[in-house]
């Protein structure tokens, strides 16, 4: 019997459907099976072959067969390189094509050369390189990953051109003429040469400025090309028109009575114009397709740059990692992975983060993305950058609305809300032109064909305000996490803990590093030992279970398990970091050191663990080990000021004041908005007996605290959040009122309210007062230090005032009672001094206070005698 005949196109179509169905249900072995068969049916080195190869390797990647996936891709890429090298004289070595003739080889090479000129083909090749590099990252082969990515000749040439342009743009400035053309080169020798590492160290603002200029120049070139194309088409149309008019004139000169011929000519001219317009429309469609391919190319190149940054970061080359992350973002600002790596790992300073965000050219429809990006920046209160306050204000207002709903009855709330909504709708209808601008409206409608024009009612339904977008997005876990981080930076630990606790309760497998770290640190600050123990126990269990699953999955597919353990290493590091915090909280030193060591061993690039390790050594008085941990943290967190500040504080403790001031000033350059920096500088001046300078620094720290408190209290005035009248708190010294009086004098801490205030407002005011007072309590040591300075200058009245203020913020502090007694002692008020000494000793026995008490008693007896 004769063999049955099959249609190859039908078989290919059926196989594609089987592959799509298998991928849709995540049956990766099935997809691998059919894509392997389809790959052998398709003509080798064709566009279709490359697409199927990518589908096969992508399925292998998803099935955790990383080595096989990267091997197949590299094998194909090496074959393409051989074709490029040998050209038309290339003789294919493959056994399948060994019988081909030279003429067939030439045809084969020409077809390959033609296909390489296709942009879609080149994009698929880039995607293959990206996938192969991803496989190498999963197997922790970072050098080979860079070798695969650096084979892209276009990118290396672009890097050389960019470096040359950097030097050309900086010829006017002498300091910038020393920049070499080999900055951020992709050669393998760069990792071994210190000179090349020094070449990578340059100002990030200069980098951002260059890339924005280069992108604008490229856009200008594109616009010029488009305008030239339009001009050429217009000229061709005009030429046709002029030619037709000349023909008409000749016909009119020959036969003036032949009007029909003229009409026919005009019709022909109109037809020609219509044909030209159709050609222009086709050209526009082609341009749109090219723009889509250009966007895809930008996305792929941005992902490749981000992958290079991850490789360099894993190799502890943070300078190059920062370079490639920035380049990825400037290529495509939608590459959140690069943005998250820069912000989460503190590779940029706060000023660099702001400048980077301003350089990213967000479209008008993506302005809401810029707000979310700004929320993930460092949580410093810069007076020059308030773009991230929108979500914070909304969160505060929603909290107060929830408190209102919990206080009043549900029926009353529904009626009030309905009335308010009706009133708001009427007001919005009356004042729509004033309240909502065109910039606040974002269209979320999908693109439709030009023939089907939507009605005005549909367009209005598709337009929403930016506030409505915020209200919907504020429930996202990552936005809630960034808000909790903001409260943690402001020492409002209860609020940050409640937010992260709610997130982890709703999504117990939410593995965001920032959320887990804020949750653990908040429990540590609040001294919630039971909650911290339970949370860390859950984290360790989830880490061990994921590690066991990873080792099981690694046996299938060859060498995948080790990479999964590496990815889980970060989660394990956070788990053991939490365990170390728990033992540090219950003062078990041996277990604390053991689990901090375990955390830093699992993830040696986790700067927070090294910072906590340094705090532990500092609390035990082990100066050298604390300094080593702080220096490691400073090397990892290059854009964070806290490690430098901690180094300075540790040097103050060992009385190395000159070196301490240098480190703290470096921290000030990174973050000039942290009051702790000015507090530590004030301590240095105090120890140097420069009391007036110390007073200025302490007052600067307290002024920053007051500005922060005002910013948060006035951030949502509609929700009555500013219940504390912080302007009554005088940090300058003279004529102060408020916290410095008695604990029961709450009137000085609040704004004047009307007599018709409801009980709900009183409860809300008291809760907000507690929040603001809790924030001010964290800066009680600064007020205490300020009182010391005034006592040293023998300004006893001001010293007593600030000691009293310190005592109101932190009651029952024996040191403050002793300081108050000693100040009265110096004034000769021995009876008051004796009372304060007794109050101090009733809380804590202290040798120095006992000595002062005996002296005060003897002096008071002599005074009465």
From Swiss-Prot:
Record keyword Coiled coil present: no
Record-level GO cellular component terms: anaphase-promoting complex; cytoplasm
Matches recorded under InterPro entries: TPR-like_helical_dom_sf, TPR_rpt
Biological process, per Gene Ontology: anaphase-promoting complex-dependent catabolic process; cell division; positive regulation of mitotic metaphase/anaphase transition; protein ubiquitination
Signal peptide location: none
Annotated SMART domains: TPR (SM00028)
TPR repeats, residue ranges: 11-42, 46-75, 88-149, 300-331, 336-359, 366-438, 478-506, 515-542, 573-602, 607-635, 642-670, 675-709, 777-809, 814-843
GO molecular function: ubiquitin-protein transferase activity
Compartments, as annotated in UniProt: Nucleus
Region (Disordered), start-end ranges: 153-293, 403-436, 738-767
Domain of life: Eukaryota
Keywords: Cell cycle, Cell division, Mitosis, Nucleus, Repeat, TPR repeat, Ubl conjugation pathway
Bias-annotated ranges (Low complexity): 249-292, 403-434
Pfam families per the UniProt record, alphabetical: TPR_10 (PF13374), TPR_12 (PF13424), TPR_8 (PF13181)
Biased composition (Acidic residues): 183-202
Function: Component of the anaphase promoting complex/cyclosome (APC/C), a cell cycle-regulated E3 ubiquitin-protein ligase complex that controls progression through mitosis and the G1 phase of the cell cycle.
UniProt-recorded name of the protein: Anaphase-promoting complex subunit 6
């Amino acid at each position: 019997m004769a063999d049955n005949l099959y249609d190859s196109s039908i078989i290919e179509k059926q196989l594609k459907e089987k592959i799509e169905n298998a991928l849709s249900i995540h049956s990766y072995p099935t997809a691998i099976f059919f894509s392997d068969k389809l790959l052998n049916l398709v003509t080798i080195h064709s566009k279709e072959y490359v697409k199927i190869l990518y589908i096969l390797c992508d399925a292998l990647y998803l099935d955790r067969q990383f080595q096989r996936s990267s091997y197949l891709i590299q094998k194909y890429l090496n074959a393409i390189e051989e074709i490029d090298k040998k050209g038309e004289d290339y003789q294919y070595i493959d056994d399948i094509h060994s019988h081909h003739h030279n003429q067939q080889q030439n045809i084969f090479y020409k077809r390959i050369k033609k296909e390489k000129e296709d942009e879609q083909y080149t994009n698929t090749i880039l995607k293959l390189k990206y996938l192969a590099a991803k496989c190498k990252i999963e197997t922790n082969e970072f050098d080979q990953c860079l070798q695969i990515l650096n084979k892209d000749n276009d990118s290396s040439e672009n890097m050389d051109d960019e470096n040359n342009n950097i030097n050309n743009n900086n010829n006017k400035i002498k300091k910038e003429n020393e920049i070499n053309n080999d900055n951020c080169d992709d050669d393998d020798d760069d990792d071994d040469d210190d000179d090349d590492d020094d070449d990578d160290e340059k100002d990030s603002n200069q980098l951002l400025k260059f890339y924005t200029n280069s992108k604008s120049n490229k856009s200008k070139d594109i616009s010029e090309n488009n305008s030239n194309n339009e001009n050429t088409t217009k000229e061709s149309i005009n030429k046709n028109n002029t030619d037709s008019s000349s023909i008409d004139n000749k016909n009119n000169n020959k036969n003036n009575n032949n009007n029909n011929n003229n009409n026919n000519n005009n019709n022909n001219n109109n037809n020609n114009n219509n044909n030209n317009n159709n050609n222009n429309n086709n050209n526009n469609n082609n341009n749109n397709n090219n723009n889509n391919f250009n966007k895809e190319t930008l996305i792929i190149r941005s992902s490749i740059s981000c992958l290079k940054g991850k490789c360099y970061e894993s190799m502890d080359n943070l300078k190059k990692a920062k370079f490639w992350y920035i380049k990825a973002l400037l290529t495509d600002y939608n590459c959140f992975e690069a943005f998250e790596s820069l912000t989460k790992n503190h590779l940029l300073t706060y000023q660099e983060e702001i400048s980077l965000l301003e350089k990213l050219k967000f479209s008008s429809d993506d302005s809401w993305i810029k707000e979310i990006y700004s929320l993930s920046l460092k949580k410093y209160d810069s007076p020059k950058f308030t773009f991230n306050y929108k979500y914070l204000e909304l969160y505060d207002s929603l909290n107060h609305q929830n408190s209102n709903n919990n206080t009043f009855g549900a029926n009353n709330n529904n009626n009030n809300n309905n009335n308010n909504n009706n009133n708001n709708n009427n007001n919005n209808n009356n004042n729509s032109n004033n309240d909502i601008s065109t910039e606040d409206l974002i269209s979320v409608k999908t693109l439709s064909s030009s023939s089907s024009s939507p009605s005005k009612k549909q367009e209005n339904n598709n337009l929403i305000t930016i506030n409505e977008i915020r209200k919907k997005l504020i429930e996202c876990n990552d936005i809630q996490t960034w808000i909790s981080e903001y409260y943690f930076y402001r020492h409002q630990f209860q609020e940050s803990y409640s937010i992260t606790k709610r997130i982890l309760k709703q999504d117990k497998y939410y593995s965001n590093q920032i959320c887990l770290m804020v949750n653990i640190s908040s429990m540590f600050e609040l001294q919630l030992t039971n909650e911290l123990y339970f949370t860390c126990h859950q984290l360790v269990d989830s880490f061990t279970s994921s590690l066991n699953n990873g080792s099981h999955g690694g046996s299938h597919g060859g060498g995948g398990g080790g990479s999964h353990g590496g990815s889980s290493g970060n989660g394990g590091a956070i788990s053991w970091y939490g365990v170390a915090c728990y033992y540090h909280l219950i003062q078990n030193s041996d277990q604390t050191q053991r689990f901090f060591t375990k955390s830093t061993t699992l993830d040696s690039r986790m700067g927070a663990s090294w910072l906590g390790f340094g705090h532990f050594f500092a609390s035990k008085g082990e100066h050298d080990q604390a300094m080593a941990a702080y220096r490691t943290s400073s090397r990892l967190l290059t854009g964070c000021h806290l490690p430098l500040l901690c180094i300075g504080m540790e040097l103050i403790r060992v009385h190395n004041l000159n070196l301490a001031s240098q480190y703290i000033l470096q921290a000030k350059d990174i973050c000039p908005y942290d009051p702790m920096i000015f507090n530590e500088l004030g301590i240095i001046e105090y120890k140097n007996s420069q009391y007036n300078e110390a007073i200025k620094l302490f007052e600067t720290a307290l002024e920053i605290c007051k500005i922060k408190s005002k910013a948060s209290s006035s951030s949502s005035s509609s929700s009555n959040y500013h219940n504390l009248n912080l302007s009554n708190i005088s940090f300058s010294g003279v004529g102060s009122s408020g916290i410095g009086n008695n604990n029961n004098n709450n009137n000085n801490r609040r704004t004047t309210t009307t007599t018709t205030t409801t009980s709900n407002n009183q409860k809300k005011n008291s809760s907000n007062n507690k929040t603001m007072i809790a924030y001010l309590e964290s800066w009680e040591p600064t007020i205490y230090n300020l009182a010391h300075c005034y006592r040293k200058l023998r300004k006893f009245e001001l010293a007593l005032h600030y000691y009293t203020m310190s005592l109101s913020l932190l009651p029952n502090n024996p040191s403050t009672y002793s300081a108050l007694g000693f100040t009265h002692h110096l004034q000769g008020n021995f009876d008051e001094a004796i009372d304060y000494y007794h109050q101090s000793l009733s809380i804590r026995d202290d040798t120095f206070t006992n000595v002062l008490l005996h002296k005060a008693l003897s002096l008071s007896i002599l005074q009465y005698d």
